[in-house]
C-alpha cells in the first residue's frame, strides 16, 4: 500500500523544521495524518475565463477539509489568447503551456502533495495542467471555470462571440457605431469564450478522458449550478486519495483513467463536436506525458469513421455552449457515440466505476432522473457580470431533439464524416490538420495559387490591402513552434479573409495554428514546419496547391525532381524567412524554440535532444 507522498515532509524527527513551517501555514498535529491536496488555481484579472476564479480555490479547500483532507492552494499563470492576438504577445501563448505544466510539477513535487485539484479554464491552462497531471500520476480531478454566456444585441439575430466582434471590425462597410455595439455585446460575462473554441473544447475533453465531472465543459460560469461542481470536486479528490493510498486501488490514478482508450474517446468526442484544431496539439502533448503511443495516425483513423453530431459556433451561428448544455452536455454526445458503437465504455472515471455507468446516469435521453434534467436546463440570464454563480435562470424545456437539435444521433448526424481531419502530402509529410466542421462542402476539394507570406503580420497587411484574390491559397510560414517561435494563432488572417468576402473563395495553409474561433478552409500545423526543413518552406508564389479533404491529401503540384532541387537550394540558404520580421525574440522564447518539436509531436520539448544535452 503506497504511503502518502506528504509523509516525506511531515513525518520523522529530521522533518521538525519542515513541520514547523507547515504549522506556520495553519496545520495542527492531526493534520499530519491527512492527505495534502494541492489546489492548482489559475485566477487572474487579465482573462475573462479566469477573472471569477479568485474564491474558487478556497471554496474547494473548505470542502476538501470537511471531507478529511488538508488543502493547500497555489496559483499558476494564464494567458488570454484573444488579448494576445495580433501582436507579439501571441508568441508567448503556446510556450505558456509548458510553463504552466512545469509550475504545477514544481509546486506539487517540491511540497510532496498527495493529489491535485486543477482549477483551469482557458486555452493553454487546461492542457498545461493536464500535461502536469499525467506527468505526476497522482490522484487528480479537473474543474473548470465554465463557459461565458453568448452575447446578445438587437443588431444580430444570433448569439454573439469574440469572432463576431473581430469580423465586423474588419468590415469596411460597417459603421463605427455598429462595431462598438458588437464590441460591447460580444463577451458579456465571465467565463471562457462562448463557442466551441479551444478552451471549451479542452474542458469538454476532460469529461471524455474521465478526469472531470459531468457538466464541466458546458455548465455556464455564471450559473449557480456550477458551484456544485467545485464542491463535488473537493469531496471527490479526498475519496480518490482514500482509494489509492488506503485501499491500494491504482485504477484511480490519471494514467490508468486517461489511458490509450480514453484518449481515443476524447478524440472521438472532439471529432464529433467539431472542436478546435488546437485540441489535437494538446492531446498529442498530453499523450507524450502519459507515455502513451497516441499520434496523428490514430487521429486520422478516427476522423474517417466518426460522424459530426454537434455543430456550435464558430462552425454555425445558431448554437453556443449554453445550447450544448441545454441539449444534455457532453454526456449526451458520449451517449450518442456509445449507441453508435464508437466509444470504449468500460473505462473508469473519477465519478463512476465505468464510463457506461456515467452515461446511463447523465445522458438526458437515457435517464428519468429529475435532478439531472433540472441541471441541464440551466441557462443564460443575459446580464453582464464578472461574478460566478450569480444567476439561476432555467430553460423551460430541454433540447432532446436528436434529429434536428443541437446534438444529433448518429443516424441524423450533421455529416457522416467528423469535424476534424488530418491531411498528408508532399507539402506536409508528417501531416497537417483542418477543422472540416467549419469548411463549406463546396470547397472540400480546392486547387489554388500560392500567395506566400513569411509572418502573420505581413499576411494581415496583404489581406487588408486586397493583395489576396479569389482562388489564392494563402501560405503563412515560419510561424511554427521553432520558427515563430511559439506557433502563433492565425485568427486575424482568417477573420479578415471572411470580412473581405473570401471565406469560400480562398484557403490558408500555415505551420502555425488557428484559434478555436477559426472557420473556413484553414489548414494548420503543417509538419515538419518550415524552420525544421518542412516542404512548406519550398513553396513559391504562384505554385499550384491541391487540397483534397475527402482523400485526406494536400500536395504542391510540382514533380519530385523540382522539389529536390528547391530543397538543395534552400539547404544552402538556410531555413529562415527572407522577409524582415520586426519582432523581439526574448531569451525565454529562444529557450522554448531551442527545444520545441513540430506540431505533429504536440509542439512539446524534444526529449531526445534534452537527453543528449543532459544525460
Swiss-Prot record:
Record-listed E.C. numbers: 4.2.1.9
Give the co-factor note.
Answer: Binds 1 [2Fe-2S] cluster per subunit. This cluster acts as a Lewis acid cofactor.
Tell me what reaction this enzyme catalyses. Answer: (2R)-2,3-dihydroxy-3-methylbutanoate = 3-methyl-2-oxobutanoate + H2O; (2R,3R)-2,3-dihydroxy-3-methylpentanoate = (S)-3-methyl-2-oxopentanoate + H2O
Record pathway: Amino-acid biosynthesis; L-isoleucine biosynthesis; L-isoleucine from 2-oxobutanoate: step 3/4; Amino-acid biosynthesis; L-valine biosynthesis; L-valine from pyruvate: step 3/4
* Disulfide links within the chain: none
Question: Mind listing the UniProt keywords for this protein, alphabetically?
Answer: 2Fe-2S, Amino-acid biosynthesis, Branched-chain amino acid biosynthesis, Iron, Iron-sulfur, Lyase, Magnesium, Metal-binding
Catalytic residues in the record: 515
At the top level, the lineage of the source is Bacteria
Among the GO biological process terms of this entry, one is: L-valine biosynthetic process
Q: Where does Mg(2+) bind?
A: 81, 123-124, 489
The kind of enzyme this is, by top-level EC class, is lyase
Task: Identify the Pfam families for this entry.
Answer: ILV_EDD_C (PF24877), ILVD_EDD_N (PF00920)
GO molecular function: any one? Answer: magnesium ion binding
Modification sites for N6-carboxylysine:
124
Q: Which residues does the annotation say bind [2Fe-2S] cluster? A: 122, 193
| Function description | Functions in the biosynthesis of branched-chain amino acids. Catalyzes the dehydration of (2R,3R)-2,3-dihydroxy-3-methylpentanoate (2,3-dihydroxy-3-methylvalerate) into 2-oxo-3-methylpentanoate (2-oxo-3-methylvalerate) and of (2R)-2,3-dihydroxy-3-methylbutanoate (2,3-dihydroxyisovalerate) into 2-oxo-3-methylbutanoate (2-oxoisovalerate), the penultimate precursor to L-isoleucine and L-valine, respectively.
**The family this protein is said to belong to:** Belongs to the IlvD/Edd family.
The protein's matches in PANTHER family, at most eight in alphabetical order, are given as: D-XYLONATE DEHYDRATASE, D-XYLONATE DEHYDRATASE YAGF-RELATED
Share what the entry says about its subunit structure, partners included.
Homodimer.
- Protein name in UniProt: Dihydroxy-acid dehydratase
The gene designation is: ilvD
Amino acid at each position: 500500500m503506497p504511503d502518502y507522498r506528504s509523509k516525506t515532509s511531515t513525518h520523522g524527527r529530521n522533518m521538525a523544521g519542515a513541520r514547523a513551517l507547515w504549522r506556520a501555514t495553519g496545520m495542527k498535529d492531526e493534520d499530519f495524518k491527512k492527505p495534502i491536496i494541492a489546489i492548482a488555481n489559475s485566477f487572474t484579472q487579465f482573462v475573462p475565463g479566469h477573472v471569477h476564479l479568485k474564491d474558487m480555490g478556497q471554496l474547494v479547500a473548505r470542502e476538501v477539509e470537511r471531507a478529511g483532507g488538508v488543502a493547500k492552494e497555489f496559483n499558476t499563470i494564464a494567458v488570454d489568447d484573444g488579448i494576445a492576438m495580433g501582436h507579439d504577445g501571441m508568441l508567448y501563448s503556446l510556450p505558456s503551456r509548458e510553463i504552466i505544466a512545469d509550475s504545477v510539477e514544481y509546486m506539487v513535487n517540491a511540497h510532496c502533495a498527495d493529489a491535485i485539484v486543477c482549477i483551469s479554464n482557458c486555452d493553454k491552462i487546461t492542457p498545461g495542467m493536464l500535461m502536469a497531471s499525467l506527468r505526476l500520476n497522482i490522484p487528480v480531478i479537473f474543474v473548470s471555470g465554465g463557459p461565458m454566456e453568448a452575447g446578445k444585441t438587437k443588431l444580430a439575430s444570433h448569439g454573439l462571440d469574440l469572432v463576431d466582434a473581430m469580423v465586423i471590425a474588419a468590415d469596411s462597410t460597417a459603421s463605427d457605431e455598429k462595431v462598438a455595439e458588437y464590441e460591447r455585446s460580444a463577451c458579456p460575462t465571465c467565463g471562457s469564450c462562448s463557442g466551441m473554441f479551444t478552451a471549451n473544447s479542452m474542458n469538454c475533453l476532460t469529461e471524455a478522458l474521465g478526469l472531470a465531472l459531468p457538466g464541466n465543459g458546458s455548465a455556464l460560469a455564471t450559473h449557480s449550478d456550477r458551484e456544485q461542481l467545485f464542491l463535488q470536486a473537493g469531496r471527490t479528490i479526498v475519496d480518490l486519495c482514500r482509494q489509492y493510498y488506503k485501499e491500494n486501488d491504482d485504477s484511480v490514478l490519471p494514467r490508468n483513467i486517461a489511458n490509450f482508450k480514453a484518449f481515443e474517446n476524447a478524440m472521438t468526442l472532439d471529432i464529433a463536436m467539431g472542436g478546435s484544431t488546437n485540441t489535437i496539439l494538446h492531446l498529442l502533448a498530453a499523450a507524450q506525458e502519459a507515455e502513451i503511443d497516441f499520434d496523428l495516425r490514430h487521429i486520422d483513423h478516427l476522423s474517417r469513421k466518426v460522424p459530426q453530431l454537434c455543430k456550435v459556433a464558430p462552425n454555425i451561428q445558431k448554437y453556443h455552449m449554453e445550447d450544448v448544455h441545454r441539449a444534455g452536455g457532453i454526456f449526451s454526445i458520449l451517449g450518442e457515440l456509445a449507441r453508435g458503437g464508437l466509444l470504449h465504455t468500460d473505462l473508469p472515471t473519477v465519478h463512476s466505476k465505468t464510463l457506461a455507468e456515467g452515461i446511463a446516469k447523465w445522458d438526458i435521453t437515457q435517464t428519468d432522473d429529475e435532478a439531472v434534467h433540472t441541471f441541464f436546463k440551466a441557462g443564460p440570464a443575459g446580464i453582464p457580470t464578472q461574478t460566478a454563480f450569480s444567476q439561476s435562470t432555467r430553460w423551460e424545456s430541454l433540447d432532446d431533439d436528436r434529429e434536428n437539435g443541437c446534438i444529433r444521433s448518429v443516424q441524423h448526424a450533421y455529416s457522416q464524416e467528423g469535424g476534424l481531419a488530418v491531411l498528408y502530402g508532399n507539402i506536409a509529410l508528417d501531416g497537417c490538420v483542418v477543422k472540416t466542421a467549419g469548411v463549406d462542402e463546396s470547397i472540400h476539394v480546392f486547387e489554388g495559387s500560392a500567395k506566400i507570406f513569411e509572418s502573420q503580420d505581413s499576411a494581415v497587411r496583404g489581406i487588408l490591402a486586397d493583395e489576396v484574390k479569389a482562388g489564392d491559397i494563402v501560405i503563412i510560414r515560419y510561424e511554427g513552434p521553432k520558427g515563430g517561435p511559439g506557433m502563433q494563432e492565425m485568427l486575424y488572417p482568417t477573420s479578415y479573409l471572411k470580412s473581405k468576402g473570401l471565406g469560400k473563395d480562398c484557403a490558408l495553409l500555415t505551420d502555425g495554428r488557428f484559434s478555436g474561433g477559426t472557420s473556413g478552409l484553414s489548414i494548420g500545423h503543417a509538419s515538419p514546419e518550415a524552420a525544421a526543413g518542412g516542404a512548406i518552406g519550398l513553396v513559391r508564389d504562384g505554385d499550384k496547391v491541391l487540397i483534397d479533404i475527402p482523400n485526406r491529401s494536400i500536395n504542391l503540384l510540382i514533380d519530385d525532381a523540382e522539389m529536390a532541387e528547391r530543397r538543395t537550394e534552400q539547404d544552402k540558404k538556410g531555413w529562415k524567412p527572407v522577409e524582415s520580421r520586426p519582432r523581439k525574440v526574448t531569451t525565454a522564447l529562444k529557450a522554448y524554440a531551442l527545444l520545441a518539436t513540430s506540431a505533429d509531436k504536440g509542439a512539446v520539448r524534444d526529449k531526445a535532444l534534452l537527453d543528449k544535452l543532459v544525460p
